[in-house]
C-alpha cells in the first residue's frame, strides 16, 4: 500500500510542476501579442462525421468534453478500487474522509453564495469552490516526501476521491440541461451492454471501449455532461478477473501518466488563459472571484476541520494512526486547491453566460488555489518532523 501511494505521488509531484508551467504559459499567451493566436487555436472548429453522426465543436470543447471524459474514466477507476479494496472499503476507513469531504463541499458553496445570493447568473457558480484538484493537492504533499505519514497521505487521497465523487453527482444533477430522450435511450442501452459484459466476466477491454465510445457520443448528445460517461465505463470494468489479475488496475496504470502529463496540463493550458488587461481593483473584489477565492482559502479548510471534529467527537469516525489535529489542519488547507476541477465546473456553470463571468471564475480559482497550496505546504512543513516517519 505504501509503495503504491509513493509511486502515485511521485507522478503527481512532477505533474503538478507541469500544471504550473501550463497555467503560466496560458496566462502569458492570453496577455501578450500572442493572445489572438491562443484564442484562435482554442476556437478552431474540429468536425467528426461518420454517416449520419456529425459532431463539430471548437477545440476547447473537445478538450473539456473529450479529454476530460478520459480523466473522469481514471477517477472512476480509482474510486471503484478504493471502494472495493482500498482506503474506502470499510466503514471505519471511510468515515473520516467522508465527513471531511462533505464539509469541504458544503461550506465553500455556502461562502460563495454569501457573496452571490440573489444574482441568478452568478449563483450558478456555487459548486466551483466545492471541488478539490486531486492531482495538484497530492503533488503539493509529495514535495514533503517521506516526512508525511502514510496514513495522512491515505486520508488526503480518500478525501479527494470522495470529493471527486461528489463533483460527479453535482455535474449530473445541476449542470445537465436540454435533455434528449433519444440520446438517453441509446445511452441506457450502452450502459446495459456494459453491465452485461461485466456480469459475464468479460475482461477484454476492447468491447468495453466500443460500447464506451457509443455511450460517450450518446451522453454528449443527450444534454448530460459527457464526462459522466467516463465514470460509468469505469464502474463497469471488472476489478478482478478469475485468474486474480485486474483489468481495471491495468487500465488505471496505463491512463495515469497520460492524465498527469498530457490531459490535465492540456486542460489547464486551454482554460487558465485569463486576459487581465481590462480588470481593475473593482473587478478583483467583485462577488464571483471573491466568493470562489474565499470559498477555497477559508471555506474548504473550515468545512473539512469542523465536520471532521464533529465526527470524531460523536465517535462516528477516528483520526488516522499517528496523526493529530495539527497535521489534519494543513491538509484541510490543501483541499482548497480547486484548480483544474474548479475551472472545469466554472466552464459548465457559465457556459451560456457572458464570457466575463468565466474569466472572473478562473481568476478567483487561480488566486484561491495558489494561496491554499502555499498555506497548506508551509503549514504542513512546519508541523511535520524533519526526518522521515
Curated annotation (Swiss-Prot):
NCBIfam families: NhaA, PRK09560.1, PRK09561.1. This is Na(+)/H(+) antiporter NhaA. Keywords: Antiport, Cell inner membrane, Cell membrane, Ion transport, Membrane, Sodium, Sodium transport, Transmembrane, Transmembrane helix, Transport. Na(+)/H(+) antiporter that extrudes sodium in exchange for external protons. It comes from Shewanella baltica (strain OS155 / ATCC BAA-1091). HAMAP family: NhaA. InterPro entries: Na/H_antiporter_dom_sf, NhaA. It is a multi-pass membrane protein. The chain crosses the membrane at residues 14-34, 59-79, 95-115, 124-144, 154-174, 177-197, 213-233, 257-277, 292-312, 328-348, 363-383.
Amino acid at each position: 500500500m505504501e509503495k503504491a501511494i509513493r509511486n502515485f505521488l511521485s507522478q503527481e509531484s512532477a505533474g503538478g510542476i507541469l500544471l504550473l508551467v501550463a497555467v503560466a504559459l496560458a496566462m502569458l499567451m492570453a496577455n501578450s501579442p500572442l493572445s489572438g493566436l491562443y484564442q484562435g487555436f482554442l476556437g478552431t472548429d474540429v468536425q467528426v462525421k461518420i454517416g449520419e453522426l456529425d459532431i463539430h465543436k471548437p477545440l476547447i470543447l473537445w478538450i473539456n468534453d473529450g479529454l476530460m471524459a478520459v480523466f473522469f474514466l481514471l477517477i472512476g477507476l480509482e474510486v471503484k478500487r478504493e471502494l472495493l479494496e482500498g482506503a474506502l472499503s470499510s466503514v471505519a476507513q471511510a468515515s473520516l474522509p467522508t465527513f471531511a469531504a462533505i464539509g469541504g463541499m458544503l461550506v465553500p458553496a455556502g461562502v460563495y453564495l454569501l457573496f452571490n445570493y440573489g444574482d441568478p447568473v452568478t449563483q450558478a457558480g456555487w459548486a466551483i469552490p466545492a471541488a478539490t484538484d486531486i492531482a495538484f493537492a497530492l503533488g503539493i504533499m509529495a514535495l514533503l516526501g517521506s516526512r508525511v505519514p502514510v496514513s495522512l497521505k491515505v486520508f488526503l487521497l480518500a478525501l479527494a476521491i470522495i470529493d471527486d465523487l461528489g463533483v460527479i453527482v453535482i455535474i449530473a444533477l445541476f449542470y445537465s440541461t436540454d435533455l434528449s430522450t433519444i440520446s438517453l435511450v441509446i445511452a441506457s442501452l450502452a450502459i446495459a451492454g456494459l453491465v452485461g459484459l461485466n456480469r459475464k466476466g468479460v475482461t477484454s477491454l476492447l468491447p468495453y471501449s466500443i460500447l464506451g465510445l457509443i455511450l460517450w457520443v450518446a451522453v454528449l448528445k443527450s444534454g448530460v455532461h459527457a464526462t459522466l460517461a467516463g465514470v460509468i465505463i469505469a464502474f463497469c470494468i471488472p476489478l478482478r478477473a478469475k485468474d486474480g489479475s485486474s483489468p481495471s488496475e491495468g487500465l488505471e496504470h496505463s491512463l495515469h501518466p497520460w492524465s498527469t502529463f498530457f490531459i490535465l496540463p492540456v486542460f489547464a493550458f486551454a482554460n487558465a488563459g485569463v486576459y487581465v488587461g481590462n480588470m481593475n481593483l473593482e473587478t478583483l473584489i467583485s462577488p464571483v472571484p471573491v466568493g470562489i477565492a474565499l470559498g477555497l482559502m477559508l471555506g474548504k479548510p473550515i468545512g473539512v476541520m469542523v465536520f471532521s471534529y464533529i465526527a470524531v467527537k460523536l465517535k462516528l469516525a477516528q483520526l488516522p494512526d499517528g496523526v493529530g489535529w495539527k497535521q489534519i489542519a494543513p491538509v484541510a488547507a490543501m483541499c482548497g486547491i480547486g484548480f483544474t476541477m474548479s475551472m472545469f465546473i466554472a466552464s459548465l456553470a457559465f457556459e451560456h453566460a457572458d464570457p466575463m463571468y468565466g474569466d472572473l471564475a478562473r481568476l478567483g480559482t487561480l488566486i484561491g488555489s495558489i494561496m491554499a497550496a502555499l498555506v497548506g505546504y508551509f503549514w504542513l512543513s512546519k508541523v511535520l518532523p524533519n526526518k522521515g516517519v
